[in-house]
């Protein structure tokens, strides 16, 4: 019996329709068919060890993993609602895949080399800081900074006291709770936080810093993870609350900033924005060499705030920076989250350190700093939700990458400058205070 030509035509049409349907599912702008092809390519490259140990290899792996894991986390019911959505899911899943050796160590080295070695993280953060600060109204920026910093610093001090008191109650002692939970969790991450902190402790105690670092590291990991989850929860629970600024930090300023015009992308200006952002990074780095006691990011933020306050940069350049920042955020945030999970979240170290007292103290830190910063934020004229996230939870996170994850989970990326401000300046203060305290508490 002969096949009717019309039926084969219908079959082909149906297949095309099905493919069309699948391709309409978009993962960060990429159709599912194209994504599946690239994912297979990545799996083959990793398993045959042909993934280049270069920027190209890192971008291919991190972007593909980051986008798909974020998409899954943003659509899974429990993660979406209670566990920080795509941000936490991406970080956790990549960390678990590394811990179970599904992702080989050489891929971790490639990813870490790109993010930390070549300092893509630095480019990402400076682009984000510059774009979010230049986007703000000049008067509003200065008003917000003056109110924000006291909230961040007082919150950190009061939280440390609360942690110490709870330490006494649960039997680990005031000194231990302060030195091994409060200080590392608020020190501003790993490189600028617990690494110098371990050196300070080692010098005062007359021991090696490696042993102390392994004691401090789990605190930063768990604190960071809890901060990300809490940021997602707070923004979700208080979605319709009057205390929610929906991304604006200063009370009563929401209506003003909503009227800000949308900047149309321009290819040449994108390149201009890149080099202006990098210029501010260089200013911060060079000033840090002259004054090594002050973190480079503190100088970067200060130089941008002063440039904005005195109107030193023409609007064309400001718009260019804003434009470039948007491109980086929209395309590379998920990749960066995957990089955090691959290279910074060591599940073995975290699980080995888990005791009920340790978990309780980390939880106390999160709850205390959220409540205190929200309350103080309200008193100082900030939106409590934004204050809790930027002046509170960001100061319990893993520095730059932690800030990105906390703000991604709460969908408040535009507040990166405030998160960095509290984290970097607050972290530096913590190191100074820890240096004094450790001599009495050791």
From Swiss-Prot:
Induction of expression: Constitutively expressed at neutral pH values. Expression is increased at low pH. Magni et al show that expression is not affected when L.lactis is grown on M17 medium with or without supplementation of citrate. However, it was shown later that transcription is higher in the presence of citrate. Expression is also induced by amino acid limitation. Expression of the cit cluster is controlled at the post-transcriptional level by mRNA processing at a putative complex secondary structure and by translational repression mediated by the CitR regulatory protein.
Gene Ontology biological process terms from the UniProt entry: citrate metabolic process
Gene Ontology cellular-component terms listed: plasma membrane
Keywords of this entry: Antiport, Cell membrane, Citrate utilization, Membrane, Plasmid, Stress response, Symport, Transmembrane, Transmembrane helix, Transport
A GO MF term: antiporter activity
One Pfam family, short name: 2HCT
Family label: Belongs to the 2-hydroxycarboxylate transporter (2-HCT) (TC 2.A.24) family.
Protein name: Citrate transporter CitP
Phylogenetic classification of the source organism: Bacteria, Bacillati, Bacillota, Bacilli, Lactobacillales
